[in-house]
Amino acid sequence: MKVININKIDTNREFLCENEKYKTIFFKFDEGKGFPNHTHNGYASIQVIDGIVDMKFENGETFELKCGDFLPFDARIEHNVIARVTSKVLVTIIK
C-alpha cells in the first residue's frame, strides 16, 4: 500500500490503483476535452476533484458535475464526459 497525493500529480492521466476487481484513474481534462461516447463491462464512478464536467448518457440522462460531486453509474450505458473548464476527476471502473 502507498499513499498517493492527487494534488501532486502532474500528468493528464495516472493509474492510481489496478487489480483484478477494479481500477482507479486520475484524469486532467482541458476545457472542451474529455472522453467520446464509450462503455465499460460493468459499473463505474466519477468524482470531480476540481472544475466542472458534463456527463451525458445515451438514455438521455445528463449531469453537470462540479468539484466534490460523486456519481456512481452503470457504465454499460454509453456515455461521454466533457470538461467545461480545466478539470480533474477520479474514475473507478469495476471489472
Please state what every model-predicted region is.
Residues 59-75:
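Short acidic-glycine-tyrosine-enriched beta hairpin
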Residues 42-54:
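Glycine- and acidic-residue-biased ligand/ion/polar-headgroup-sensing regions
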Residues 75-95:
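Ligand-binding loop in jelly-roll beta-barrel domains
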Residues 15-18, 27, 35-40, 57, ...:
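Short histidine-centered beta-strand/loop micro-motifs
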Residues 49-50, 66, 85:
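A cytosolic small-molecule/anion-sensing beta-strand core signal
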Residues 25, 34-35, 51-56, 70:
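Short beta-strand segments in beta-sandwich/barrel cores
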Residues 2-33:
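A short glycine-rich, His/Asp/Glu-containing loop-to-beta-strand
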